[in-house]
């Protein structure tokens, strides 16, 4: 039985965001790097998982720790601090699941580089966007604030020629923040992703999201979309957020907000399937929440892991309330 009886509605949605992000990462790890044809030849249709995820969840939970340690005001330096103090999570047993340029950036921190310098030379990745869900929870109901904080945090690993990855992080964070608004729908949270991105500097990512969502809505079905997307929107680096973020948002649309459908569709999408699933599952979890119906779906996760994610959700919700109270108090003081 899921440990949800005592949770508030907000806490249930935050828990679902984290739990389904983990499921998306774990299920997608089976098909990561594969194209759809190879997935079908090897597995048929993927709809099961084992394990607790890869680098996506590790980096996400390090960011959550940074937010908790700073009462919700984490910046790029604070995330870097968690990379250093918990470096065994990056360089440990799952180090082979990290993209090389991120391991290189983390190694720079170990060698006393300033955090603001480690992004130099990094390749395009989804490291910040795949990890950004806690920012959406802490800024729940305020997509603009979520986008601003996500942009700052993403600058740890994405600057200059790959700064568009900041836009990807802003899009995912604002989408999750918008999912906690009363009356939120699939369409409203997807619109939040577009609205979060600067229309001038972020024009490339913004346009890609708009175009890919239009393709999803006009496609006959998921497989037709998948074929068209992989013909026109794939990048040389499969973890490039210009590919993964629009794809994840399209998975949200095809799943109509159902987190299980989102992670299954993501796993069968191929390419950077675990990262796409982590983002899509997190968004849909935040939108839909969690109930007893999810027990069987989440059963492959170890009980200890589920409890850890539950406590993490509770901590992030508490930080949200604390931060919101502090912001209200600050804005109420004026001469």
Each PLM stretch: what is its role?
Residues 1-335:
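Structured, active/binding-site neighborhoods that engage oxygen-rich ligands
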């Amino acid at each position: 039985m899921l440990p949800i009886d005592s949770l508030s509605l907000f806490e249930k949605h935050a828990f679902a965001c984290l739990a389904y992000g983990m499921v998306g990462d774990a299920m997608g790890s089976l098909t990561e790097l594969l194209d759809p044809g190879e997935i079908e030849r090897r597995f048929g249709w993927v709809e099961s998982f084992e394990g607790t995820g890869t680098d996506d969840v590790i980096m996400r939970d390090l960011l959550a720790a940074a937010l908790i340690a700073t009462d919700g005001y984490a910046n790029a330096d604070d995330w870097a601090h968690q990379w250093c103090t918990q470096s065994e999570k990056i360089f440990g047993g799952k180090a082979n699941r990290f993209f090389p340029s991120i391991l290189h950036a983390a190694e720079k921190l170990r060698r006393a580089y300033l955090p603001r310098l480690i992004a130099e030379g990094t390749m395009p990745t989804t490291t910040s966007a795949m990890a950004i869900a806690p920012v959406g929870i802490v800024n729940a109901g305020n997509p603009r604030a979520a986008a601003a904080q996500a942009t700052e945090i993403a600058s740890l690993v994405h600057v200059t020629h790959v700064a568009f990855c900041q836009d990807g992080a802003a899009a995912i964070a604002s989408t999750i923040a918008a999912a906690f608004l009363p009356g939120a729908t699939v369409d409203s949270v997807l619109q939040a992703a577009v609205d979060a991105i600067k229309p001038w500097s972020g024009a490339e990512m913004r346009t890609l999201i708009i175009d890919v969502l239009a393709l999803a809505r006009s496609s006959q079905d998921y497989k037709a979309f998948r074929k068209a997307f992989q013909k026109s929107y794939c990048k040389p680096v499969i973890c490039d957020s210009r590919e993964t973020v629009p794809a994840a948002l399209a998975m949200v649309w095809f799943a109509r907000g159902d987190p299980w459908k989102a992670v299954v569709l993501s796993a069968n999408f191929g390419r950077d399937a675990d990262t796409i699933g982590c983002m899509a599952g997190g968004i849909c979890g935040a939108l839909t929440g969690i109930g007893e119906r999810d027990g069987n779906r989440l059963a492959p996760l170890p009980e200890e892991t589920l409890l850890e994610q539950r406590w993490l959700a509770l901590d992030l919700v508490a930080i949200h309330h604390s931060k919101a109270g502090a912001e209200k108090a600050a804005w109420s003081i004026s001469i």
